[in-house]
Design a protein with these regions (language model features):
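Extracytoplasmic beta-strand/coil segments of soluble accessory domains associated
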Residues: 45-84
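Short acidic/polar hinge/loop motifs at secondary-structure boundaries
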Residues: 66, 84-113
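Structural signature of outer-membrane beta-barrel domains
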Residues: 12-14, 73, 85, 147-149, ...
């Protein structure tokens, strides 16, 4: 005998992302965590390559730098919640996107046209990463992934854990996220010197 089956889903993030994209005055792509979670992307660099108009530069097999509209990566700006992210390298503006775990981001906003309310230092466009907010109900999420790098002949491991809750009559919200990525890289490299 067939029992009742109830299937539920939460697409609020995707609905908000589509509304934000539709109501934008400029050319803007918004991708929610719902969409990012459909793919096995361990970092933001991997998630960005799925957005139209975005290209990523690879370094040692990792999607490291984001390019907007075909311009160089240092002609685009990267912000987290609207605050500028500095480069880990001292001589360039490129932001290493492979260092930012995808589990910690709620929404990716890609502005392909700089508007008057934005800094005028991003010729290609800007990438804004919006972090997760604390939910109104307890939220626990764990992810795990593994792989094998044939060049370095070593195993890869990706782990993620996210916890969110509100306390004291919803006056204090907490969102904790931890991520571990062990990706032993290796490359077959040939460089020519002229």
């Amino acid at each position: 005998e067939l029992q009742e089956v109830v299937v539920g889903g939460a697409f609020q993030g995707q609905r908000r992302a589509i509304n934000s994209q539709k109501n934008s005055l400029g050319i803007k792509n918004v991708v929610s965590a719902d969409q990012v979670g459909k793919f096995p992307d361990s970092n933001i660099g991997d998630a960005l390559k799925r957005i139209s108009g975005i290209n990523v530069q690879y370094d040692q097999g990792e999607a490291r730098f984001g390019q907007v509209r075909g311009t160089s990566a240092d002609m685009s700006s990267v912000t987290i919640n609207g605050n500028r992210v500095p480069s880990a390298e001292g001589d360039t503006r490129n932001v290493q996107l492979d260092l930012i775990p995808a589990d910690m981001i709620q929404t990716i906003e890609v502005n392909k046209v700089v508007t008057p309310d934005m800094d005028a230092d991003a010729i290609g466009g800007s990438i804004n990463l919006v972090t997760k907010n604390s939910p109104y109900k307890r939220f626990i999420s764990a992810t795990a992934g593994t792989g094998y790098n044939w060049i370095s002949d070593k195993a890869q491991l990706n782990l993620g854990f996210t916890y969110g809750d509100r306390f004291f009559n919803d006056k204090l919200g907490v969102m904790l996220s931890a991520s571990y990525q062990n990706s032993p890289s290796g490359s077959d490299d040939v460089e020519f010197v002229w």
